[in-house]
Curated annotation (Swiss-Prot):
Coiled coil: none annotated. It comes from the Bacteria. Belongs to the class II fructose-bisphosphate aldolase family. Disulfide bonds: none annotated. This is Fructose-bisphosphate aldolase class 2. Catalyzes the aldol condensation of dihydroxyacetone phosphate (DHAP or glycerone-phosphate) with glyceraldehyde 3-phosphate (G3P) to form fructose 1,6-bisphosphate (FBP) in gluconeogenesis and the reverse reaction in glycolysis. The keyword Transmembrane helix does not apply. Pathway: Carbohydrate degradation; glycolysis; D-glyceraldehyde 3-phosphate and glycerone phosphate from D-glucose: step 4/4. It holds the Pfam family F_bP_aldolase. The active site is at D83 (proton donor). Its EC number is 4.1.2.13. It comes from Synechocystis sp. (strain ATCC 27184 / PCC 6803 / Kazusa). Keywords: Glycolysis, Lyase, Metal-binding, Zinc. GO terms for molecular function: fructose-bisphosphate aldolase activity; zinc ion binding.
Length: 359
């Protein structure tokens, strides 16, 4: 089989009440880790790459690594997603390079630093949706800026993230605006701002409702029951990996991520895609440091890379179980981009809100 549209996976997740972790990839070892975990847990897969990852790996290398996963695991439905596309051009180049899903992040302007107006966000996102849907590709939009409700600041990821401080009105997705945004853009998925941010340093204490607004997801889901919601910046930052890194020479200070139980609450309220990167980075770093410390004379790269696959695979398998993804890959009938282009053309996948239906 070929890669599948992300919409196919999100629809199945919604129908069956589970979420799908979307793991960022940059190299072969990360893809192997994810696919081994998915194979062992019978889980559908969303691989995603940022602009930085595409630049780091190179378009051709990245594309063939992903196709290698498809050929090796033909029984697992896999979507390849562009994370945080900063402009329509970025999204179109991703589709040309084989991505079956793109994120048009119009919450920021094309410089990926300046918070954008609602009108700008709607216009660029709707433009991408029109083009992507014509070829069957899925589109994720974002409303609100990702950042900390504690500090008002965000953490740039591969150069993508606002600068300075924002107030809560910009850091929390407005439910009524979300309805208007979905109706005007027809996105397949909506990333919501609830106080999470990129990187390891998300919260200075275990998050509560004051700094992690899971209740905002519930409000949005009530108005948009048929829209697939997305949580960004949702690594849990497990203490075990931080302890291991620091045991073997690291210096990561105390920090807190998004507790798994909070993500599970989100999944029960319409979250279908959960973005995770930092947890895997921590596991890989722990493996490298441990391997180097225990055998300092070894200079074979495989000595460091093999344990990194093992540890990252552990993280991925845990998330597939915790998000109730496990056991669902074999239940999904794989469809193509052409199949979905036909569905969009016929209006079968038109987004509706509770408000618009009532009218």
């Amino acid at each position: 089989m070929a890669l599948v549209p992300m919409r196919l996976l999100l629809d199945h997740a919604a129908e069956n009440g589970y979420g799908i972790p979307a793991f960022n990839v940059n190299n072969m070892e990360q893809i192997i880790s994810i696919m081994q975990a998915a194979d062992e847990t019978d889980s559908p897969v969303i691989l995603q790459a940022s602009r930085g990852a595409r630049s780091y790996a190179g378009e051709n290398f990245l594309r063939h690594l992903v196709l290698g996963a498809v050929e090796t695991y033909p029984h697992i439905p896999i979507a390849m997603h562009q994370d945080h596309g900063n402009s329509p051009a970025t999204c179109y180049s991703a589709i040309r390079n084989g991505f079956t899903s793109v994120m048009m992040d119009g919450s920021l302007e094309a410089d990926a630093k300046t918070p954008a107006s609602f009108e700008y966000n709607v216009n660029v996102t709707a433009e991408v949706v029109k083009v992507a849907h014509s070829v069957g590709a899925s589109v994720e939009g974002e409303l609100g800026c990702l950042g900390s409700l504690e500090t008002g600041q965000g953490e740039a990821e591969d150069g993508h993230g606002f600068e300075g401080k924002l107030d809560h009105s910009q850091l929390l997705t407005d439910p009524e605006e979300a309805v208007e945004f979905v109706n005007k853009t027809q996105v397949d998925a909506l990333a919501v701002a609830i106080g999470t941010s990129h990187g390891a340093y998300k919260f200075t204490r275990k998050p509560t409702g004051e700094v992690l607004a899971i209740s905002r997801i519930e409000e949005i889901h009530r108005l948009l029951p048929n829209t697939h919601l997305v949580m960004h910046g949702s690594s849990s930052v497990p203490q075990e990996w931080i302890d291991m890194i620091n045991e073997f020479g690291g210096a990561i200070p105390e920090t807190y991520g998004v507790p798994v139980e909070e993500i599970q609450k989100g999944i029960k309220s319409g979250v279908r895609k959960v973005n995770i990167d930092t947890d895997n980075r921590l596991a890989i770093t722990a493996a490298f440091r441990e391997a180097a410390a225990k055998d300092p004379k070894n200079f074979d790269p495989r000595h460091f890379l093999k344990p990194s696959i093992k540890y990252m695979k552990q993280v991925c398998a845990d998330r597939y179980q915790q998000f109730w993804t496990a056991g669902n890959a074999s239940k999904i009938k794989q469809l193509t981009l052409d199949d979905y282009a036909a569905k969009y053309a016929k209006g079968e996948l038109t987004a509706t809100s509770r408000t618009s239906v009532a009218v």
